[in-house]
Structure formats: structure tokens, C-alpha cells
């Protein structure tokens, strides 16, 4: 059984999660999660990964406009940006590119820790219903 961006949103896995761009990509399957802050080695990003970031890398609009198309071309499932550290909202250039490419961008509030994100997502992705592994295997 697969787990998708749609599932993440509609099962309310993380409170106050918002889909802000790339709505047409909600069917993208999530097979893994990756916490990233510096995307200087995009070849280390795998297809069907859901990226979590504080948005540090996106502060410099001109330098990083190419990242959304690059991530979409690598078949990344989508990106979740934790607002409140480096970004208070998702920049318009990111929303526009993500919508054009059906690349989902979601936001979570600052009070949801990456530790909580990893624990919850690993439970989901490695649950008996998804892969045959159980929580005790983690």
C-alpha cells in the first residue's frame, strides 16, 4: 500500500499542515523522508522522497530559483517547509514554479519538531500496512 501527499494532508498527520502549492501533485507517493538544509548535492536526493526543511536555502531567491525544477526532475515527492525560522511564508517564485510543475509544497508550524516529523513518518512508512515492517524494527 502506498502513502501519498494526499494521505499526509487528509489524515492530518501533522496539525496545521497546509498545502500551499503543487496541488495537482497530491498523488505523489512518499517512500522516504529527508531533512535537508543545504541542497548543494542534488544527486543525493532520491525519487519519492519527501523533503523537510526550515527554508534556510531559499532565503536567496536569485541563487536558488532552479531548485524547484531540479527537485521535480528528480521525482522528489514534495517539500515541507517549517515556517518561522528562516521563512515566514513560502516565496511567490517557489509557489509559481511548484504549481507549474505539480510539485507539492506544504508548510508546518515551528512548534512541530523535526524529531517528531521523523518519528511519525518512519512509523507510517515502516508500518505493517505499508512495508511489512513494524515499529519495533525501527
What residue ranges belong to the model's regions?
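Alpha-helical/coil-rich non-catalytic "connector" segments in signaling and regulatory proteins
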Residues: 1-138
Amino acid at each position: 500500500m502506498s502513502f501519498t501527499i494526499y494521505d499526509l494532508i487528509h489524515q492530518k498527520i501533522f496539525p496545521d499542515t497546509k498545502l500551499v502549492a503543487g496541488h495537482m501533485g497530491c498523488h505523489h507517493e512518499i517512500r522516504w523522508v529527508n531533512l535537508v538544509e543545504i541542497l548543494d548535492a542534488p544527486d543525493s536526493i532520491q525519487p519519492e522522497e519527501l523533503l523537510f526543511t526550515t527554508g534556510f536555502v531559499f532565503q536567496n531567491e536569485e541563487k536558488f530559483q532552479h531548485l524547484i525544477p531540479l527537485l521535480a526532475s528528480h521525482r522528489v515527492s514534495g517539500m515541507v517547509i517549517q515556517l518561522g525560522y528562516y521563512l515566514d511564508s513560502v516565496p511567490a517564485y517557489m509557489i509559481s514554479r511548484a504549481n507549474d510543475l505539480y510539485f507539492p509544497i506544504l508548510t508546518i508550524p515551528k512548534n512541530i519538531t523535526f524529531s517528531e516529523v521523523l518519528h511519525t513518518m518512519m512509523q507510517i512508512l515502516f508500518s505493517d500496512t505499508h512495508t511489512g515492517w513494524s515499529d519495533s524494527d525501527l
